[in-house]
Amino acid sequence: MIQKIKILILLNVLMANIAFTKELPALFEVKIPEDQYTNTNDGLNKAFNQLIQKLSGSRSKKFLWRIGDAQLNKIEFVSSYSTELIGEQEFLSVRFNGESLIPELRKIGTPLIGFNRPVILILFKIDTGESAPVYLSSSSSSDQLAAEIKQALKNIALERGVYLELPEFDLEDQNLLNQANILFSPSNYIEEKFYNDAFLAIELVRIGINQWSVNGDLKSISPLQEKQVIEFFKNAVHEFLDDLLEVKPLEPGALGERVMVSIQGLKNFQDFQSVESELDKIFAIKSRSFHAFERTKIDYMTQLFQTKDSLMKELRGSTKFLIKEYNADTNQLKLEYLN
């Protein structure tokens, strides 16, 4: 009863017109290229396996083994499927029922990542030694190797459920990147200019006839032939994402942490609705209750499925919340609502 009274008071404080929130991204949809499955049943099974990788942030087979041990029927979670043509390639597009799947994954201890996904900004420099180095951008590329690298990044982003983005350079950017100034850091400049939750600076350099070297945040330990370059980047980016997305499960018998979440920056009832909607999307939160509220701020007591790190990883990709401060002594996380 007290909780209901608090909510009613809060609604009166934040009176405003009701508005609809934005649609959620296609978290429970998976697309499998036609050359990666033999028949529809095989495609549906592979789509489910890819969904588990997407939801857990992990490529570990142990989560699939748990599903097998629990004797969950993968096909039962399929809501719909169809084939579609993307570019010149046909895909099996599968949509899964998240409402029925998520509780089952919780039961078998699968760590999950919600709808908020990180943006990884990539500054990618290619130096062939024949002309001035070039930086890959989000625009189309006529060079075959550059086009293959960009397609590989696009496929990985789709598979892992993250955003792997290349900058869109304006004329000022191009002039700065092409200047020969040892005091200018292209990496620092691009990282500060464009939004990102994580940043990779990569340099691909030709060091001989059909020999390439990779430097920067991703490094090759030996020269690569051109035909090996794409496979190297696929493996290296996947390994980077393994570390970035990993949600460590609790020790057997351990309980999830409790965290006070304080959200400031609310202006009206529409903001309150948006906050509630955004919190509903966060898989790290098991339950929440109102602790205190003011006109522009709400405090929630949250019970997590895992540790606060899992919550922080989800919030890192949020477009609605900005992490301001975490106080370990009071176990309080302060967020700014971005409206």
Where would I find each of the regions flagged by the language model?
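Amphipathic beta-strand/beta-sheet edge segments enriched in Tyr/Trp
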Residues: K22-E34, S100, Y189-V237, N331-N339
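Bacterial N-terminal signal peptides
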Residues: K6-A16
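Short, surface-exposed ligand-recognition loops at beta-strand->loop->(often short) alpha-helix junctions
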Residues: Q144, S262-D271, L304-F305
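Signal peptide-directed extracytoplasmic domains
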Residues: L64-I126, S131-Y135
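A short, hydrophobic beta-strand-centered structural micro-motif
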Residues: N73-S82, L123, Y163-D170, L177-Q211, ...
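Sec/Tat signal peptide C-region and signal peptidase I cleavage site
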Residues: N17-T21
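Extracytoplasmic
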Residues: N188-Y189, F305-A328
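N-terminal segment of the mature soluble domain
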Residues: L44-R66, P118-N181, F194, V275-M301, ...
